[in-house]
Amino acid sequence: LKSLGIEFDLFSEEQRLYENGAIDNVLKRLEELSLSYKKDGATWFKTTSLGKEEDKVLVKSTGEPTYRLPDIAYHIDKVHRGFDLIVDIFGADHIDTYPDVLLGLEALGIKTDHIKVIIHQFVTLKKGDEVVKMSTRKANFITLDDLVDQLGVDVVRYFFIMRGANS
C-alpha cells in the first residue's frame, strides 16, 4: 500500500487480541449477558435474542474462531483508543458477518453510529480476454505489489478509482 501513497499510523495484529485477553473478555461478557451458549462443541452468539432469525457461531467446534469474534474484540479496542470515526473496508466475503459484529458491539453497550462499513467487491483481472481465477487457498493470486510492478502506480490507482466499491 505504501507504493500507492497509503500509510498506516498503527498496524494491529490479531494475535495481540488473544495475548492481551480481549478475545476471552468478549466471550466472558457475552456469556454474562446470556448471549452465548455451547452447542455441538461450538460457542454460539445468541443473535436470536437480539432480533435475528438464527444464532451465529463465534468459535467452531475445532476451537477456531469465526471472523465475528476477533472483529468484535478489535472494534472494542478501537473504540477504547478514542477514535471518533472508524471506517471498515471489507471484502464481499464478509457481507454476512459484519452486521453480527455491529450487533455484538451494541449488545456489549458500545455505540456503532461512528462505524462506517464499506463492502468492496472482489477485483477481477483479465489476461487477454480470459478472466483469471483467483484463490488464496490454492495460492493463485496477484498481490498489489505485483500489479504496481507490472502496470505502474498511476495505472493501478486509475483502475481502482474508476469503479465504486460495489462494482
Identify the meaning behind each predicted range.
Residues N20-H80, L105:
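A contiguous, basic/glycine-rich beta-loop/short-helix subdomain that forms a polymer-engagement track
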Residues E7-D9, Y18-E19, K46, L58-V59, ...:
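Generic, ordered loop/turn and secondary-structure boundary motif
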Residues E14-N20, T43-L50, I118-K126, R163-N166:
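A glycine-rich phosphate-binding loop feature that marks nucleotide/adenosyl-phosphate handling sites
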Residues E7, E14, D71, H94, ...:
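A general marker of short, structured functional hotspots
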Residues I6, S12-E13, E53, D129, ...:
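Residue-level signal for pocket-adjacent positions within structured domains
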Residues L1-R29, Y37-D40, K78-G91, D113-Q121:
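Conserved alpha/beta enzyme-core scaffolds, especially Rossmann-like or related mixed alpha/beta domains
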Residues H75, V79-S167:
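Catalytic adenosine-cofactor/nucleotide-binding cores of aminoacyl-tRNA synthetases and other
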